[in-house]
């Protein structure tokens, strides 16, 4: 059966896939050792997951994302960064891919998303600072919140 187009050209089939990939991002986020915010990222290209990532510390460091004062350590790698770095270390490319996130990107990650060639970002929760979404808009990366 043909896909029924909803507003913005999104089809029911696309929405179904979007929800499924966000559920995968939830599972990935649960692997994070961070206490304050567990974030998951899934990169999908041609209907296949090519990478996933969650926020955490660098390889070889203790899995402690927060300082004693409760703030996130500077050396924590964001979920988007982990997923994008996995693609960079593989034979895959992010060109035209969709990134699924449990939390919208910060400005730092939005820059990487743009430069990696991600075409679309789907996220569930909004980060406290929306500068990252603003950059995506200015650079032509479509993004949408799916609750």
Give names to the regions the model predicted:
Residues 1-147:
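Zinc-dependent deaminase catalytic domain
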């Amino acid at each position: 059966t043909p896909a029924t187009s909803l507003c913005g050209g999104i089809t029911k089939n696309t929405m179904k896939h979007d929800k499924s990939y966000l559920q995968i991002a939830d599972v990935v986020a649960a692997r994070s050792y961070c206490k304050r915010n567990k974030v998951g990222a899934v990169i999908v290209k041609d209907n296949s997951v090519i990478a996933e990532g969650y926020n955490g510390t660098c390889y070889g460091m203790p899995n402690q994302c927060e300082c004693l004062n409760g703030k996130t350590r500077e050396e924590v790698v964001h979920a988007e960064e982990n997923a994008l770095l996995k693609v960079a270390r593989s034979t895959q490319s992010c060109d035209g891919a969709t990134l699924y996130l449990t939390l919208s990107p910060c400005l730092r990650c939005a820059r990487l998303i743009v430069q990696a060639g991600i075409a679309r970002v789907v996220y569930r929760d909004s980060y406290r600072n929306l500068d990252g979404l603003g950059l995506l808009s200015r650079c032509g990366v479509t993004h949408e919140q799916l609750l």
